């Protein structure tokens, strides 16, 4: 259908919920694979990680320092309140890779890996490794909000956010890119 008058609000919300649930299930499978690779033999339940009913904020792209992925966690106490809110839960899914010769970009991923293990954020903040087109597809389709907070004026276009908006994802951005 190309005429939005033929799609009811209920159908639209049902579709958004379906693609978010698919993203959550995909992320759980990826996290299980990551864990088995890093700590084989360890049994961790991944079915409790991420909530299909929670507002899902995504950040998936090449990791470069100017893109400032971990910036939002500078307000750590506020983030903890958001993810712990039982009435309106929020969760974060990060994915990406640094350029092979970008050591600073590689180091920029480390705080996210450590944050996901923090007891107050566990299960609400995840990092999906081995970012590729398949991960990108799942993320741009399933996230509710796309995070974009690069250092101005360094973002040329912000295509990941453009793709996410085509799937009904809202942008949470500074005035750069997009």
Task: Walk through the language-model features, giving the residues of each.
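Catalytic cores of carbohydrate-active enzymes across secretory and cytosolic contexts
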Residues: 1-178
